[in-house]
């Protein structure tokens, strides 16, 4: 089973706990990096905690939940080696792994309910990167991240 790391801000707290329980019941190894209450908190700090677990290799994939998923995805994508996608439909959650080799799924607790959230999570976790023509495009994302804009010419 894949090693998953999950985090949320105050808006995603209840949904995060539901997702964790379901993933653990399915046998996933889940690390919770917070937040641990509904008290208002800074989502960039949670995104940073999660991203460092993936960057270090301690965890393979991450899930971030905030109100819309957008703030978390913006923060996560500032971290080297992180490819975070904000998704609210299963097609995108699957293809972001297949084509973009995304390693963090973001969604909003104010956008999707538990049922859709689990559909997104399952699609994301079950999908694999297809490589091939997509690998060259992911390499260009990495080049951009490293400031090698000449690779884009």
Residue spans for each PLM region:
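Nucleotide donor/acceptor-binding cores
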Residues: 2
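C-terminal binding/interaction regions
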Residues: 5-7, 11-12, 90-153
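Residue-level detector of anion-binding/catalytic polar loops
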Residues: 29, 83, 103
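A short beta-strand-loop structural module common to alpha/beta enzyme folds
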Residues: 29-40
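Helix-adjacent hinge/juxtasegments
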Residues: 46-86
């Amino acid at each position: 089973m894949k090693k998953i790391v999950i985090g949320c801000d105050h808006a995603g707290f209840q949904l995060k706990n539901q997702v964790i329980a379901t993933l653990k019941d399915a046998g996933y190894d889940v690390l919770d990096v917070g937040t641990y209450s509904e008290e208002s908190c800074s989502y960039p700090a949670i995104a940073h905690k999660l991203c460092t677990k993936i960057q270090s290799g301690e965890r393979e994939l991450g899930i971030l939940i905030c109100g819309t998923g957008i703030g978390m995805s913006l923060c996560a994508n500032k971290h080297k080696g992180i490819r975070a996608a904000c998704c609210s439909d299963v097609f995108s959650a699957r293809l972001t792994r297949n084509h973009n080799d995304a390693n963090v799924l973001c969604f909003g607790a104010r956008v999707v309910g538990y049922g859709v959230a689990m559909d997104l999570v399952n699609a994301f976790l079950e999908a694999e990167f297809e490589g091939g023509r997509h690998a060259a495009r992911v390499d260009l994302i990495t080049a951009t991240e490293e400031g090698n804009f000449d690779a884009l010419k």
